[in-house]
A protein has these predicted regions:
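Fe(II)/2-oxoglutarate oxygenase catalytic core
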Residues: 1-165, 173-206
């Protein structure tokens, strides 16, 4: 992976990289399109509400990564981990305090023209989500018209480009929107990193 600097006049704590293997992104798109039976209407913390979020998703659980069908996503998580290690190098405090985090279930998402995640949102908004520390996302294809990720508190808009990967704090400080896609198709894979919560995860940390 190659680190990308996001130009801003203020510190924003948004890590950005390009993955070296663009083929990986194409294979994840193929996985999505070849599994229509797994696709669901996009859900947010408000449930199914097209005014808040309008996408088509495939949810992926950690156990799914053990199945041959999802081998490509297991490889992807390995690439995401490399990005996180570089993120730690940029902020050494993370190495000493948060050396063990977990990736729970995540989504592959497809956007058609008119689709969006237009509601301003963050990933840590209640006691039920308080264990989330970071959010992450990889754009799986280039998008020419719309579909940017807008971190409005920082005046930062990220254009979707193949393999571009983001990691950012899950807090309200990094509330953002997924702007309306005006033409074409947009694919992403996205999820969270969290503190250990289950008994099994806590034992692994010890």
């Amino acid at each position: 992976m190659k680190r990308i600097n996001i130009n801003s006049q203020q510190t924003h704590f948004i890590g950005c990289w390009n993955l070296e293997n663009n083929k990986l992104c194409n294979e994840i798109i193929n996985l999505f399109e070849n599994n229509k039976n797994l696709q669901i209407q996009g859900i947010s913390d408000k449930g199914i509400d097209p005014k808040t979020k309008k996408t088509t998703d495939i949810p992926v659980s950690p156990n799914d990564l053990k199945k041959p069908k999802f081998e490509i996503l297991k490889k992807y998580i390995g690439e995401l981990h490399k990005c996180f290690l570089d993120y730690q190098n940029q902020w050494p405090f993370l190495k000493s305090m948060f050396n063990t985090l977990y990736v729970p279930s995540f989504n592959i998402q497809k956007y058609l023209p008119g689709d969006h995640f237009a509601a301003l949102h963050s990933e840590r908004t209640s006691i039920n989500t308080s264990h989330r520390l970071f959010a992450w996302m990889t754009y799986l294809n280039d998008v020419d018209d719309g579909g940017q990720t807008n971190f409005s508190h920082y005046g930062i808009k990220i254009n979707p480009e193949t393999s571009k990967t983001l990691i950012w704090p899950a807090e309200w400080t990094h509330a953002h929107t997924g702007e309306v896609l005006k033409s074409g198709t947009k694919y992403i894979v996205t999820g969270w990193m969290h503190f250990p919560t289950s008994d099994e995860e806590i034992k692994q940390k010890k």
